[in-house]
């Protein structure tokens, strides 16, 4: 069908002539996951901490989409859009791939291979997961993605803001032209891997505050310098190449001593607490998904389902006939069916189409 054709075209495009200036991110832009992220970014807003109104993290699933939306607006409408989606809260697909890989997966060696590599790995895995585990993709998942962005950008900004250069002689240990692209993900992974077993970051607090605590910043100040010292001792290898090796991360993780401060540990929460929040979010999302499925079925109308029932009567089980009959009743009355009965007709459609 159409979906198979779309997937085939995208698959061919991924292996097309590499001379064409098409990135991995461009090829993944129409994947359902990125469409979902775009929709979620427009409706799930952050609390007004830095701003006077709730604001969104605009997810740009295709290039220049943020700019194109602004071109349609004028005057007060444009001001409202920029107030709701400030430029500093713009996030694109490559950035999400980097942030997710660095923070959620703790794989600094993958991040060090560059945005295209990270995008291919992230894009392929996440597209498959989105197809098979849809309830995983919920408000809490979105919030964690944004928290990952906040963590990554906070460290990046810290190095950029304090860097020592000929124009701005700060005396800071990080110099202009340093290995920031490697220091940031390695710092994140080092801090997070040192969290005691059974504990985790308070993702909800980071989302609510839209910033990191002073205790977290203290760890960043210590570990960024430690990370720089470690990667610069690259045993004769080019530092950027050294950072791409999984063995480099494993060595840093297991052999370089580091214990988070007491104040940082105190801010952590039990892993079970975050797991409970995650499970609740999955349940809520499953209900939303089931409701949407039911609505989609009702929208097809009673005539569609009556025709299907007539055409496939010899192929449809008694249970499936009962489900379709219920959908017909619901389509007629406008009432929403239960999620249990709402699932069966989609199976029936595939049986009849295959006949």
Where would I find each of the regions flagged by the language model?
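Active-site histidine-anchored catalytic micro-motif
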Residues: 1-3
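C-terminal catalytic or substrate-handling cores of phosphate/nucleotide-
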Residues: 5-157
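Non-catalytic all-alpha helical scaffold/repeat segments
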Residues: 146, 160, 165-168, 174
């Amino acid at each position: 069908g159409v979906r198979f054709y779309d997937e085939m075209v995208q698959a061919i495009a991924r292996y097309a002539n590499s001379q064409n200036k098409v990135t991995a991110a461009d090829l993944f832009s129409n994947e359902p996951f990125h469409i979902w992220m775009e929709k979620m970014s427009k409706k799930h807003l952050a609390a007004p901490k830095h701003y006077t109104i709730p604001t969104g993290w605009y997810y740009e699933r295709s290039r220049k989409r943020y700019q194109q939306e602004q071109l349609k607006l004028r005057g007060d409408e444009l001001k409202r859009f920029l107030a709701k989606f400030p430029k500093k809260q713009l996030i694109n697909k490559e950035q999400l791939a980097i942030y997710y890989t660095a923070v959620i997966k703790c794989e600094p060696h993958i991040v060090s291979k560059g945005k295209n590599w990270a995008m291919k790995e992230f894009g392929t895995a996440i597209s498959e997961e989105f197809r098979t585990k849809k309830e995983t993709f919920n408000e809490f998942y979105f919030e964690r993605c944004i928290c990952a962005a906040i963590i990554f950008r906070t460290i990046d900004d810290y190095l950029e803001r304090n860097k020592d250069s000929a124009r701005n002689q700060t005396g800071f240990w990080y110099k202009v032209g340093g290995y920031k692209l490697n220091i940031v993900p390695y710092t994140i992974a080092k801090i997070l891997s040192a969290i005691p077993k059974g504990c985790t970051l308070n993702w909800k607090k980071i989302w609510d505050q839209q910033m990191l605590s002073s205790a977290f910043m203290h760890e960043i100040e210590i570990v960024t310098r430690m990370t720089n010292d470690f990667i610069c001792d690259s045993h004769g290898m080019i530092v950027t190449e050294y950072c791409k090796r999984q063995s480099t991360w494993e060595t840093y993780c297991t052999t370089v001593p580091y214990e988070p401060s007491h104040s940082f540990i105190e801010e952590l929460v039990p892993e079970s607490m975050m797991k409970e929040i995650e499970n609740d979010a999955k349940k809520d999302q499953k209900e939303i998904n089931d409701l949407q499925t039911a609505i989609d079925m009702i929208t097809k109308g009673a005539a569609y389902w009556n025709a299907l029932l007539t055409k496939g009567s010899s192929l449809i089980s008694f249970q499936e006939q009962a489900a379709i009959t219920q959908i017909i009743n619901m389509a007629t009355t406008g009432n929403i069916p239960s999620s249990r009965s709402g699932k069966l007709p989609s199976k029936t459609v595939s049986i009849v189409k295959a006949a």
